[in-house]
A protein has these predicted regions:
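Interhelical loop and adjacent transmembrane-helix boundary motif
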Residues: 2-5, 45-53, 137, 208, ...
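Transmembrane alpha-helices
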Residues: 12-15, 70, 100, 144-166, ...
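C-terminal transmembrane helix and the adjacent membrane-cytosol boundary/short C-terminal tail
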Residues: 3-10, 90-91, 152, 159-174, ...
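Cytoplasmic-entry segments and transmembrane alpha-helices of multi-pass inner-membrane transporters
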Residues: 7, 82-113, 170, 184-185, ...
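C-terminal structured domain segments across diverse proteins
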Residues: 177, 304-308, 321-326, 330-568
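Transmembrane alpha-helix signature in integral membrane proteins
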Residues: 52-83, 247-261, 339-373
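N-terminal signal-anchor/first transmembrane alpha helix
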Residues: 1-27, 92-98, 247-257, 278-307, ...
Length: 568
């Protein structure tokens, strides 16, 4: 990329990120430090730690995040290690099935989870017991459900870390008489710690700020739900913004610590060329012993999915303290698609997600070109800024957009213009801010996808085209873009599908029924007495199938590089 072009792209993307990301983030933080007379104050921040309700919420969120990260690691580590060490028939299929839990947002899975593990659920009916498997206050259920949904992120990071370890280290220890466990504890585990920490950071941040799952599980004593409830109040309460700052500080601190520990680290012996680990080929009974942990984990992880699917086919009141539903119906699906708010929510989500996908394509490609194809001095700054949304929870971004909307809609020029009010007032029309939220938060996926494609495409092809007289635009259109199309499609699919099922931004920004996205509609339907959870489950199955198709498509296009999109 020519330097003048790179500078223009750099400047434009920097402006967009500053206005659409950094400024709302600053507003979300600022509102927690400004007194009614406009003076700087720490009263609200210290008040968060003095208020026993807020303090309990923070501690519960940290407990859930730590528990989720630990449990997700315990789920992911054994199959990842076995996959690295052994080769057996069906390994490719099992590795694909490991990713299946990602096709269902945890808060949707909570509906099915309660039907199976609730006090009057299927498991108690099978065992003839009356145990609250989800734990007092549902916190144990939140941890288990989020772990089953997020362990694939840990699995992708651990397998990548194991694949990068030079096997010569393990062989040298074996030749010196070290046992298998000793080699794992003293060589493999320390060398894979950066990968563990990278995956654990994403899981921790995700679980720490998750909003939908605690809401569905009716576990309200967590910071995310406290922020959500407080921001719905009229009167401009500053304490939730101070709480948002604390959550942002924890998330960003972990993210940068991860970058510090993981960034640029390799796993090879100095002075030697790393060779691929030769997996041991297994067959017969030994192969089944290795398959068993995969199968048990997949069965456990799919429990929420089965619960949602069965609930979607259950007649209202037809599954109560029984092993299986006693009355089935397909009417939930027709009612879900025919309900007053579901059709518009599907249309809204399709529109919002499509616009977000276009946004990430345009700016993701531009950022990738600047970072990979230019020699600008500050290109690393742009790359780091583009990846920073990974460290910022959706709840925090939504708070920032609410603050930005309030600021803009109170301007006299905006108040006097119906068109501008419709554009900038989230209470009137949240389209602009939902598209921004979806696009900014998924931008890292597109940047990494495009950058991976460019890194695999020789810059000499573009230089040859330039030497033959082709303009940069012609070279981009006829050479570069066709070569990285698969990566762009994969990134676009992930952006589109995860935007369709975004929870925190949708719940907080969509305040009028006519603009509800799918996830907000599922939550609202779940609140209905009687048929609510059955219709919500039917809509959740539709969303699950949609995300499954896009994840499979992205996996086929990216192959093993899919895991790179879920690493810090």
């Amino acid at each position: 990329m020519r330097k003048p072009t790179a500078r223009i792209v750099f400047s434009l993307t920097l402006i967009v990120l500053a206005v659409g990301f950094l400024f709302p983030l600053w507003l979300a933080v600022r509102n927690g430090f400004v007194s009614p007379d406009g003076q700087f104050t720490l009263r609200y921040l210290t008040g968060v730690f003095r208020n026993p309700v807020y303090l309990e919420g923070l501690l519960n969120s940290l407990r859930i995040a730590a528990g989720t990260t630990l449990l997700a690691t315990l789920f992911a580590l054994p199959p990842a290690w076995l996959s690295n060490r052994y080769s057996f028939a069906g390994k490719t299929g099992l590795n694909a099935l490991i990713l299946v839990p990602m096709i269902l947002p945890p808060f949707v899975g909570a509906i099915g989870f309660q039907q199976i593990l609730g006090q009057y659920g299927a498991l108690n009916a099978l065992l003839g017991l009356n145990i609250d498997w989800l734990g007092r206050g549902q916190w144990a259920g939140v941890i288990l459900l989020q772990s089953l949904s997020l362990f694939p992120v840990m699995y992708l990071n651990i397998t990548a870390a194991l694949a990068n370890i030079d096997p010569a280290m393990d062989e040298a220890a074996q030749n010196l008489g070290a046992s298998g466990f000793a080699r794992f504890r003293r060589i493999t585990l320390p060398l894979m710690m950066p990968g563990l920490f990278a995956g654990g950071t994403i899981v921790f941040i995700w679980a720490f700020t998750e909003l939908g799952t605690p809401l569905i599980m009716n576990y309200t004593r967590v910071a995310s739900v406290q922020v959500y409830d407080a921001l719905k109040e009229i009167g401009g309460n500053p304490f939730p913004f101070a709480l948002v700052f604390v959550m942002l500080a924890v998330s960003a601190g972990l993210y940068f610590l991860s970058k510090l520990l993981v960034g640029g680290r390799t796993y090879t012996l100095p002075g030697k060329t790393a060779t691929a680990f030769q997996a041991v080929r297994l067959a017969g009974g030994r192969a089944w012993l290795v398959r068993l942990p995969f199968l048990l984990l997949i069965m456990l992880a799919l429990l929420p999915h089965f619960g949602v699917i069965l609930t979607s086919f259950t007649a209202p009141g037809g599954w109560y303290h029984t092993i299986l539903p006693q009355a089935f119906t397909t009417g939930n699906y027709s009612e879900a698609l025919g309900h007053g708010i579901t059709v518009s929510s599907i249309r809204n989500s399709l529109g919002f997600s499509l616009l977000a996908m276009i946004f990430t394509l345009v700016f993701g490609i531009g950022i990738a070109f600047v970072t990979v194809r230019s020699n600008l001095r500050f290109r690393g700054l742009l790359d780091g800024l583009a990846m920073l949304p990974l460290a910022v929870p959706g709840l925090v971004m939504a708070s920032g957009y609410l603050a930005l909307s309030s600021l803009l809609s109170n301007l006299e020029t905006v108040r006097n213009s119906p068109a501008l009010l419709n554009l900038f007032d989230v209470k009137t029309n949240p389209t602009l801010f939902l598209v921004l939220a979806y696009g900014i938060r998924r931008l890292p996926y597109m940047v990494r996808s495009a950058a991976a494609g460019l890194q695999q495409t020789s810059a000499e092809l573009e230089e040859s085209a330039a030497n033959l007289g082709a303009s940069p635009g012609v070279s981009l259109r006829r050479i570069t873009l066709p070569l990285i199309t698969a990566h762009l499609i994969a990134g676009a699919l992930l952006t589109f599908s995860f935007s369709m099922l975004e929870v925190s931004d949708s719940l907080m920004l969509a305040q009028r029924e006519e603009f509800y996205p799918i996830t907000k509609t599922i939550y609202e339907l779940f609140q209905l007495i009687g048929t609510g959870k059955y219709i919500a489950s039917a809509l959740g199955v539709w969303a699950m199938l949609f995300l499954a198709v896009t994840l499979v498509g992205s996996s086929l296009l990216l192959g093993k590089k899919l895991g790179a999109l879920f690493r810090t």
